[in-house]
Amino acid sequence: MNRFTGKAAFVTGAGGYIGGTIAKMLAKDGACVAVCDLNEETALRTVREIEEAGGRAIAVACNVTDSASVDRAMERAVTAFGRMDILVHAAGGSARSAMKPLIEQTDEVIQSVLGVNLLGGIYASRAAAREMVRQGEGGRIVNISSVVALEGLRGCVEYAASKGGLIAMTRSLCKELAPCGITVNTVAPGIVQRPGETNDAVHTNFLGIRCTAEDVAHVVLFLASDEARFVTGQTYAVDGGRSLAMKGTD
């Protein structure tokens, strides 16, 4: 039996590279997946790939910066699957800001980055936690942060703040939800490369290899599984050791 047979998952940003890979791997391992994305077309593309592989999924258009939109999306997922067991907040790719000193950054970019990365995580976690608490069978919440939140990086102040906020939220929320058997953890990837990309990212980690979305997804699936039942409030860096050498300025 697959690890997630009988489980329902809600993945934000699942029309993107990392979120889509996580959604597909959850489905391959037996989960029913709500593929949530601001862009419904990209969500549908992920759903088609899941269905072609024999999995079950629905596409849900969702603006994670709007709490009402998140609540509606969660309601639709629960209606479709009858339950909710796993949340992965992976939305954020479209909110990446151009690297600029904070004194040059615009309000629009700052609000967008904080809205998608941090507020989106808070809204999605609240919606999922409500369903998990109501069910009374525990659950798993996994937020996608970044190694930038661990060590800082010039030109990314608002991005680091938003991803660092997810880590702080994880540490607090895990304490609130622990009595309900719900774990909350964070995964902090380094530079994740798409197939065919070539750049110097391979030189920014100790292992000297490229990080793929699958590398991130493997850790997410562990944290979403029963194998991680005794793991909560933690942040897992998936970066080949890069965060150990960043020193805030690299």
Regions found by a protein language model. Give the residues of each.
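Short C-terminal tail/terminal secondary-structure segment
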Residues: S94, M99, E151, L221, ...
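Active-site helix of classical SDR
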Residues: S125, S162, T170
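Short, small/polar-rich loop/turn modules that mediate ligand/substrate recognition or access, typified
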Residues: R83, A178, T183, V231-G233
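Canonical Rossmann dinucleotide-binding motif of NAD(H)/NADP(H)-dependent dehydrogenases/reductases
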Residues: N2-A34
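Substrate-binding pocket helix/loop in short-chain dehydrogenase/reductase
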Residues: A98-L102, T106-Q111, A201
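Alpha-helical segment proximal to the catalytic Tyr-Lys
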Residues: R130, K175-P179, R229
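Residue(s) in the substrate-gating loop at a strand-loop-helix junction
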Residues: S146
